[in-house]
Amino acid sequence: ITDTILEDVKEWLNRPLKPLYSFVFVDCIYVKMKNDHGVVDNHAVYVILGVDAEGFKEVLGLYISPTESKSTWMKIFDSIKARGVEDILFLSMDGVSGLEEGVHSIFPQTVVQRCIVHLIRNSTKYIPSKHLKAFCADCKAMYGAINLESAEAAFETLKEKWGADYPGAIKVWENNLNHIRQLFNYPADIRKVMYTTNAIESVNSSLRKVTKKGFFENENSVFKIFYLRITGELAKKWNNAKMQNWAKVLNQLSCLDETSDRIARYIR
């Protein structure tokens, strides 16, 4: 049975993909797995989730412990292109080293966005728990602002209010201000998809349920369990449902100069 499943897994990991993905999310989940010396340690599994031109979600690929470099990510996205993908409009990621350059070497027009949830996590490491709620509300005033001007003002407020006591937290946002500013090049509904990671978080929380206990013998055992989870529970949960608020997002993608022609080609 296992061998049959592994054949299915291999086929699934190399299956043809859609020609366009409006949004792609890259995130990672850690699993305990034996290394080449038989020692159990942590390995990163990168999960790539796509939302197609019609708002449907699918996991495009799983990649175990890739070296975080431009050439590795270039190979990964080259293999995604070889499976039929012609264009990716937006890609959201945690600041994975080399990913942005790797994507752009294959899909030069893709807009790469730092995931806001990860920026919040990285900045709140510096904030004591009693202030978390207030700090997060001030962060939301920035990335959830109605326009760039309000976002810039909210950042100044954040800096004035928290900068003296918690400079580490402010530094995280300061270093990524270009990603906050970039959000405001797009209408509100597209912005929301770009900065929220609900889609990939739900995939990862489902996968975490099967990685909690024990460890994996090898990469194949990881792929097998993840494949069964993705094509079983997650496929049932998604049940061909479109991404929330998709009609509005599609309208905005169809009106934007930089995406209208690119998406029109692929809508039935």
Model regions and ranges:
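Conserved beta-strand -> loop -> alpha-helix junction used to position metal-binding or nucleic-acid-contacting
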Residues: 1, 90-97, 102-138
